[in-house]
Structures are given as C-alpha cells and as structure tokens.
C-alpha cells in the first residue's frame, strides 16, 4: 500500500490521504513503511497478547468504524486479504462510505484456504465500489462473480512498484556474506502451522544436507508457535541462518542474492519473478496462478518428499533451473500505483494525469 499512499500524496493539494494502521505486527509494519518515508497517521493499537482472531476483528472494526465516523472520508481504500482490509470494507459499508479494493479478484475458490484470507478478500469484493485487480485473470474472477465491468480496472500489482523501488536503494548492503548458493525459506501461513510447517522445515534441512554449497536463510515470523517449530528443526546448523524479519530493503536485497525461494507467502510469489527467481510455493492452491502459468513458480504443497524432489531438481539440474529463472514476471511494470491514483481521483470527480493501461 505504501506506493499507493505516496502516489496519492503527490496530489495532496487535491485531497488529503490518511494512513491508518490497526497496530498488528507493529515493528514489521513501521520498518517497512520507513523504507518509503511513511508513518501511520493513526495507529489504532488493537493488539493484545494471546487474543483470538475474533477479538482482533472486533477491536479493529470498533476502531475503524469510530475513525470513519470522526473523519467522514470520501473513500476508504484497503489492500489485499488481511483482516484489516476485511474490517475496513465492512466498516465502510456500514457507514455507507465507498470502498476501493487494491489487489482485488484473487481467488482459490476454497473459502478456508488460505484461512482466513480467502474469506477476507471475498467480503471486500462484495462491498467494493472500485476493484483494482492486478491481472486480467483476477479481473475475470470478478466478472464471473457478477461485478460491474465499469468498476473493474486492471492495474498490475502495487507490490511490484514497492519491490522495484526498494531494489534501487543502492545503500542497502547485500546479504548474506556467503560464497555459495543461498536458498530463502519463508513460512508463516496459518493453515501451515503445526505438522505441515514441520514437514516444510524438515525438507529444507534435507536440501541443505544434500547440497554442501547451500546456505539456507529463514526470516522468522513473530508468532511464537512458528518460531519454536523452526528453531527445533533448523536451529544449530552451521549453514542455516534463522534471522529476525529484515527491514524491507534488506529483504529485497536478500531475494536478489538468492538462487531459489521456498515460500508460502503470496507477496513473495509476486516479487521474486521480478528478479528472475524461481519460487517453490509451499501450498496446495494459490490465488496467484499467473506465476505458475508463466513458469516462474511451482506448487509443491507441504509434502516433504515433493519439496525435496523439486528443490533438488532446481539446485541440481542447470537446465531445469534456467527454464524457471528465464520466465517473465506477469504481475506488473512498476506503475500500478499511478493507475490506482488516476481511477481513485476519477471516481471522486478530480482530474489527474492518466496512465497507460496494464496488460
């Protein structure tokens, strides 16, 4: 969302943009926003230790609803499939305020996979007045659901805007210092907690053991359950680095340094192909099939044998690796935020410079 906020604020003489955080994963969010010179204008501070998803949702809804009542915005914008976006859409709907959904139309068509993200984005799509799907495939999903074509605008993904801007930050050091190949593992999705995540970690460990030149780097999610499992399986190995979540520019540089990525992250599925990096997707389904169709990503699920087989194939077969590494990214050209800005202001009756459509 940061590139969208920056783009809207280029025209701050025409409209005020208020950046709101619910306060989830505050340290990670603030570090990411600082990359773009941003801080939240409002932090609702909803997080409490040990609270349930229902409690997070309730507190976020109360906070956003109160803020909408106080500030009376002309439009609420939410991005992606988070609980915050779901709640923002619901609060805007209750207040009869228009809602715009950035990264709209992603679907697995399985309501609880990923959980709760598939539900979150479907609800956001139900109430949205403006839909900004990143690709034509996502736009087709919206059309099949009966959304009005005149409210759907394909923009490319704003995450590509962010990753390309961060990659241009030449002051960020390359990481890590390792002469051999680097493999990146990111795993945090709720549906992978427990046994699936253990299988993922064991598969990654086996790949490190098979290939003596490989260093595995694992940024650890703040959730204690995730961290404890990763440490129990992967801790103590000289060629495995368990690290705190890096600041966004460092994470981008880390991706650029890698040879291969194993991830259950939706964002990483989109970002890695921008650098020609193969991604093994640690999920059974994906709402981002464009990368799979383009050859930049492969679904491997959470089966240990399948992860090891596909990882070893890419690390051991140069031709197989080249086929995935040379595929073209289908997710954007770095101008998605400008397209969002143009359509948002158009919706509000304000004229700003147009941008060539993304196809």
Cite the ranges covered by each PLM segment.
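Nucleotide-activated sugar donor-binding and catalytic core shared by glycosyltransferases
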Residues: 1-218, 223-359
């Amino acid at each position: 969302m940061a590139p969208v906020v920056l783009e809207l604020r280029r025209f701050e003489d025409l409209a005020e943009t208020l950046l709101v955080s619910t306060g989830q994963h505050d340290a990670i969010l603030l570090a990411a926003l600082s990359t773009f010179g941003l801080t939240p204008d409002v932090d609702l501070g909803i997080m409490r230790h040990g609270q349930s998803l229902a409690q997070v949702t309730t507190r976020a809804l109360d906070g956003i609803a109160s803020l909408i009542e106080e500030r009376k915005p002309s439009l609420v914008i939410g991005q992606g499939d988070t609980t915050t976006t779901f709640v923002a859409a619901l609060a805007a709907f209750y207040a009869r305020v228009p809602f715009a959904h950035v990264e709209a139309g992603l679907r697995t068509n399985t309501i609880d996979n990923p959980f709760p993200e598939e539900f979150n984005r479907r609800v956001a799509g139900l109430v949205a007045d403006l839909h900004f799907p990143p690709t034509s495939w996502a736009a087709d999903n919206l059309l099949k659901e009966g959304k009005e074509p005149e409210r759907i605008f394909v923009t490319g993904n704003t995450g590509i805007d962010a990753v390309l801007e961060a990659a241009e930050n030449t002051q960020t050091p390359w990481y890590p210092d390792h002469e051999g190949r680097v493999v990146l593992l990111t795993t945090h999705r709720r549906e992978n907690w427990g046994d699936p995540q253990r299988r993922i970690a064991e598969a990654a460990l086996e790949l490190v053991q098979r290939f003596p030149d490989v260093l595995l780097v694992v940024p650890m999610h703040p959730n204690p359950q995730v961290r404890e499992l990763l440490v129990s399986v992967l801790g103590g190995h000289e060629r495995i680095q368990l690290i705190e979540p890096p600041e966004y520019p460092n994470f981008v540089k880390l991706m650029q340094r890698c040879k291969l990525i194993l991830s259950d992250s939706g964002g990483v599925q989109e970002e890695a192909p921008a650098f020609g990096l193969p991604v093994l997707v640690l999920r059974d389904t994906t709402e981002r099939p464009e990368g799979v169709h383009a050859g930049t990503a492969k679904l491997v699920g959470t089966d240990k044998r399948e992860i090891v087989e596909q990882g070893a194939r890419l690390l051991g077969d140069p031709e197989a690796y080249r086929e995935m590494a040379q595929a073209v990214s289908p997710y954007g050209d770095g101008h998605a935020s400008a397209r969002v800005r143009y359509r948002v202001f158009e919706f509000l009756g304000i004229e700003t410079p147009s941008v060539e459509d993304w196809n």
